[in-house]
Amino acid sequence: MTSTRGEAAGIPSVSLNDGHSIPVLGLGVGELSEAEAERSVAAALEAGYRLIDTAAVYGNEAAVGRAVNASGIPREEIYVTTKLAVADQGFGTSQDAARASLERLGLDYVDLYLIHWPAGDHGKYIDSWGGLMKAKQDGVARSIGVCNFNAEHLSNIIDLSFFTPAINQIELHPLLNQAELREVNAGYGIVTEAYGPLGVGRLLDHAAVTGVAQAHGKTPAQVLLRWSIQLGNVVIARSANPDRITSNLEVFDFELTDDEMATLNGLDEGTRFRPDPETYTGP
């Protein structure tokens, strides 16, 4: 299944296990102020992005919604993701939180609603998954999924609910390439979505990355995004800089060789720059 979303910028889409599809590259707005988020989303949509990723805990859903609604782009062409905060986990509270997110966004539905963190409480995230299933049934969210879930978290919710997430969004970059978890996701038919694809900037001057960039006449950031896309991931790239937002789109006119992919894959050392999902408990 393909989508018109992102076609203007040449962004392909991938099919989800529920029949919907999602662009393979999007803009993230984590840690951006409301003003920064509104400007960034407006710039991204103008540049051709059609996937925007926010969360309740980011505190900028309203700004994202303003930019989406002011863009003049038909709503069905924009893919909006938001996430359930740890504090709102639970069967009923997750549904209330989803509707509160819609109100802040000023939208009738979100394309994707995610549990932001498992947060260590087995019962809570399972109850929350039931709440997300109800939110999907009620039309609040077109697709539902999870973030930061490991193999055990996934099996817990799937075995108990008989319903599989569409997406698992995880920290993923060459220093943490998540090969085993990507394989688990694929086994369930779950699309892997990568956040932190630049390794919080730590990889931009790595010799292996800059060498590949020079070979293609591309920036290190473009190489890192291309690497993740070639692995089969959907990629969320955060930026408040309009020039970088545009530059990050220029990843569909070249391809990394098998040797270059192997070089970047070989950088994996299990390094996290974001919290460990097995120990993180909020917010």
Curated annotation (Swiss-Prot):
Molecular function terms, GO-annotated: aldo-keto reductase (NADPH) activity
Sorted UniProt keywords: NADP, Oxidoreductase
Pfam families: Aldo_ket_red
Alphabetical list of SUPFAM superfamilies matching this protein: NAD(P)-linked oxidoreductase
Binding site for NADPH: G196, L198, V200, I236, R238, S239, A240, R244, S247, N248, R274
Active-site residues from the entry: Y58 (proton donor)
Matches recorded under InterPro entries: AKR (IPR020471), Aldo/ket_reductase_CS (IPR018170), NADP_OxRdtase_dom (IPR023210), NADP_OxRdtase_dom_sf (IPR036812)
EC number of the protein: 1.1.1.-
Family the UniProt entry places it in: Belongs to the aldo/keto reductase family.
Name of the protein in its database record: Aldo-keto reductase Mkms_1984
Organism from which the protein derives: Mycobacterium sp. (strain KMS)
